[in-house]
């Protein structure tokens, strides 16, 4: 098996077929809806909150609300009252089952539910998928996180409508350091490996450092890319604002950090400061333009045309050209 990550790969251009990148369609369909970009901000407390999720939904972007210190039932009710879709996160503990029961009791059906735990290839996830499919069959269920083909096969067979691939490759995740496990350092290979057996959409989660990594993720099988650090640090971001030597930063920490949990127990995340980088809307526009450019370099007009390109690996024993692998 060939091992590489985002910084080891470059995609090879094909003849351009458009006059302007604005002719390229960067949209993607997930479930019953289409979204402007194959990108979703990470469901983390320092990345998204209720106002950001509402704005994303109103402007044609996908979102997943985090599951920490949140009344999911109230959130779903509010989003539907405002005429937009509801996309929530659940764990696999009793309070999460109680949330499902409350949603059913109130006749609320979230359009998207993400089962969001650190090690998603687990019987506990199997049980929650089954419960959701029984109680809320109208919800599109995303399950993760995972990092192997075996996990993709199992989660799909258990009923997941999409899987989320990535074990600890994120900027504020230290899973590989704390446990010795994960996809950190080879996330793009793991994505390629998992996509080979997937029959349903994959969301690549973590390891994205530059906008070009979005195109690389799509090339190797992702339908959607979850990003934390590039979305943290905006003026609207919920993280606490910190001033250091006259410069403004936003706090950004992992979901399994002690900062998020409020206690030092089973910690697999850390806290960093992200320089404030302006408005979220401006970043999303720039991302869309960059993805459109990627499509034009791929010789296409639609997002999935990126999957048709060849690529090269940079450096190491595996260096060389790879044709449509």
Curated annotation (Swiss-Prot):
Which GO biological process categories is it annotated with? purine nucleotide metabolic process
Family named by the database record: Belongs to the IMPDH/GMPR family. GuaC type 2 subfamily.
The record, for Pfam families, names: IMPDH
Which domain of life does the protein's organism represent? Answer: Bacteria
What cellular component GO annotations does this protein have?
A: cytosol; GMP reductase complex
Recorded source organism is Variovorax paradoxus (strain S110)
Q: Catalytic center at which residues?
A: 173 (thioimidate intermediate)
Q: What is its EC number?
A: 1.7.1.7
Keyword annotations for this protein, in alphabetical order, are: NADP, Oxidoreductase
Return one GO MF term.
Answer: GMP reductase activity
* Reactions mediated catalytically: IMP + NH4(+) + NADP(+) = GMP + NADPH + 2 H(+)
Q: Tell me, what does this protein do in biology?
A: Catalyzes the irreversible NADPH-dependent deamination of GMP to IMP. It functions in the conversion of nucleobase, nucleoside and nucleotide derivatives of G to A nucleotides, and in maintaining the intracellular balance of A and G nucleotides.
Positions binding NADP(+) in this chain are 202-225
**Which protein are we looking at?**
GMP reductase
Q: Which Gene3D superfamilies match?
A: Aldolase class I
Is Transmembrane there in the keyword field?
Answer: no
């Amino acid at each position: 098996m060939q091992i590489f990550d985002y910084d080891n790969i470059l995609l090879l251009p094909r003849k351009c077929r458009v006059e302007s990148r604005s002719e390229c369609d960067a949209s993607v369909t997930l479930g019953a809806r289409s979204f402007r970009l194959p990108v979703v901000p990470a469901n983390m407390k320092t990345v998204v909150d209720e106002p950001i999720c509402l704005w994303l939904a109103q402007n044609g972007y996908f979102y997943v609300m985090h599951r920490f210190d949140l009344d999911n039932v109230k959130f779903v009710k509010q989003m539907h009252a405002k005429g937009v879709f509801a996309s929530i996160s659940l764990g696999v503990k009793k309070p999460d089952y109680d949330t499902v029961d409350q949603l059913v009791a109130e006749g609320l059906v979230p359009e998207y539910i993400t089962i969001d735990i650190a090690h998603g290839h687990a019987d506990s996830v199997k049980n929650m998928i089954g419960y959701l499919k029984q109680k809320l069959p109208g919800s599109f269920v995303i399950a993760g996180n995972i990092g192997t083909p075996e996990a993709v096969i199992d989660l799909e067979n258990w009923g997941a409508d999409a899987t989320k691939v990535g074990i600890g490759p994120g900027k504020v995740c230290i899973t590989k350091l704390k446990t010795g496990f994960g996809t950190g350092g080879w996330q793009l290979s793991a994505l390629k490996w998992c996509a080979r057996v997937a029959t349903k959409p994959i969301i690549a989660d973590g390891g994205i450092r530059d906008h070009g990594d979005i195109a690389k993720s799509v090339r190797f099988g992702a339908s959607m890319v979850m990003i934390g650090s590039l979305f943290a640090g905006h003026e609207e971001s919920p993280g606490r604002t910190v001033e250091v030597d006259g410069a403004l930063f936003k706090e950004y920490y992992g979901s399994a950090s002690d900062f998020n949990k409020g206690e030092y127990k089973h910690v697999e995340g850390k806290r960093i400061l992200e320089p404030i980088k302006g408005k979220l809307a401006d970043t999303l526009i720039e991302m869309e333009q960059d993805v459109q450019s990627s499509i034009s370099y791929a010789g296409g007009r639609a997002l999935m045309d990126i999957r048709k390109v060849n690529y090269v690996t940079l450096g190491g024993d595996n260096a060389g050209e790879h044709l449509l692998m």
